[in-house]
A protein has these predicted regions:
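A short, Trp-centered hydrophobic/proline-enriched beta-strand micro-motif
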Residues: 1-5
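Short Gly/Pro-enriched turn/cap motifs at secondary-structure boundaries
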Residues: 9-12, 36-39, 53-55, 81-88
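Alpha-helical interface subdomain recognition
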Residues: 11-16, 23-28, 91-93, 110-256
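Short, solvent-exposed loop/turn segments at the edges of secondary structure
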Residues: 14-16, 42-43, 58-59, 87-89, ...
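Flexible, small-/acidic-enriched active-site or ligand-binding loops
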Residues: 16-17, 71-100
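Short beta-strand-to-turn element immediately C-terminal to the catalytic PLP-Schiff-base lysine
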Residues: 22, 48-52, 65-67, 93-95, ...
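A short core secondary-structure module
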Residues: 31-75
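Short, charged, solvent-exposed linker or helix-capping segments at domain edges/interfaces
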Residues: 60, 75-77, 100-108
Length: 256
């Protein structure tokens, strides 16, 4: 399946939805565009967030179930991304898509609450992704530092590299604890809005710092595709952006 929230003019500000679903008694008529949709072409079922009443603000947003092949539903451009290139990311276009009334999820106006809840849980997953990227970059860097020699000794014997590895390790351990804490909150059915935002912010920042240092430790080899750290650095960047940017996480943390 695919979760369809972001639009060309509605990213961090999810309330500024331009996608409209007009109520025609026994059905809705959907028009608009969605961007950055993961599983855009491979999904068979889509949860689409759309505005039904602009005057009601976030209370005028609903979520609808759509299926691939519905008349007027077009899978458009596949994004040529910096990282996570194996992820199927597309633009979706909706031109007068007729949606049965029973395809609306929940009560009228439920869409915004649904979207925010989905993002809050998704942030824990992105934090775990970032943690995995950072840990992978650290493991590769540690192994490389034990093999690569300069000035008559392996580079892990140089204090400059030791300090980099030590900082990477501390960052990763902190991120791991925050990720596990937020996941535990969710498992225990506790409020995880704050802990999820903290975990995602810290883990994504750690992933970016760690992968940059991993490339530096590898030197020239870190810059070529023969070694995996350049890919990890490209993959790390998106964790600071999707499911809410680092700046949005700071807003969530401050408000909680």
């Amino acid at each position: 399946g695919a979760f369809c929230l972001s639009e060309p003019e509605a990213g961090s500000d999810a309330t500024s939805q331009r996608q409209k679903a007009i109520d025609y008694w026994d059905h809705y008529l959907l028009n608009g565009t969605k961007n950055w949709i993961t599983n855009g072409s491979t999904a068979s079922t889509y949860l689409v967030i759309a505005q039904t009443d602009a005057d009601k603000g976030h209370n005028g947003i609903n979520v609808f179930i759509l299926e691939k092949g519905m008349p007027g539903f077009e899978i458009s451009v596949k994004e040529d991304k910096l990282g996570i290139r194996g992820s199927d990311t597309h633009t979706l276009v909706f031109n007068d898509v007729k949606i049965p009334k029973e395809n609306r999820v929940g009560d009228n106006g439920f869409g915004f609450k649904f979207a925010m809840k989905t993002l809050a849980g998704g942030r824990i997953g992105i934090a775990a992704q970032a943690l995995g990227i950072a840990a992978g970059a650290y493991d590769l860097s540690l192994a490389y530092s034990k093999e690569r020699e300069t000035f008559g000794k392996t580079i892990n014997k140089h204090q400059a590299i030791q300090f980099k590895l030590a900082d990477m390790y501390v960052d990763i351990e902190n991120a791991r604890n925050l990720v596990y804490k937020s996941a535990w909150h969710k498992d225990q059915k506790m409020d995880y809005n704050l802990s999820g935002a903290v975990a995602k912010l810290h883990a994504s920042e750690v992933a970016m710092r760690t992968t940059i240092e991993a490339v530096q430790i590898h030197g020239g080899y870190g810059y070529v595709k023969e070694y995996h750290v350049e890919r990890l650095m490209r993959d790390a960047k998106i964790t600071q952006i999707y499911e809410g940017t680092s700046e949005i996480q700071r807003i969530v943390i401050a408000r909680n």
